[in-house]
């Protein structure tokens, strides 16, 4: 069965928040039209699920991802960066959204 998970809005986000909101609205409408269920998980909840801390920074999230999966995305995708940047942080967040959906929806 189909089910979509999304990370909720970060209320302190900067940049193109209107574009993000616009596109998310369209996505939600299309999912509703197709009767595909949607679960939105807040950024704080994703961080708490991954690390036990709702205010975990990108470094801690990436470190936990490496512990959980054995993959060093930072080294593989952005070896020249001293900080965790995209796409690494987006992939890490997506992993934990999927993991949470698995436990809530698939695994019962």
Short names for language-model regions:
Residues 1-108:
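Phosphate- and other anionic-substrate recognition elements at nucleic-acid/protein interfaces
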């Amino acid at each position: 069965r189909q089910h979509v998970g999304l990370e909720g809005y970060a209320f302190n986000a900067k940049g193109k928040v209107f574009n993000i909101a616009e596109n998310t609205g369209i996505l939600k409408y299309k999912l509703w039209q197709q009767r595909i269920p949607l679960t939105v998980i807040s950024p704080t909840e994703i961080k708490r699920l991954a690390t036990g801390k709702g205010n975990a920074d990108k470094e801690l999230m990436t470190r936990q991802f490496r512990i959980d999966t054995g993959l060093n995305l930072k080294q593989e995708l952005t070896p020249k960066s001293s900080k965790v940047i995209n796409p690494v942080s987006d992939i890490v967040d997506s992993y934990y959204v999927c993991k949470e959906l698995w436990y809530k929806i698939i695994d019962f």
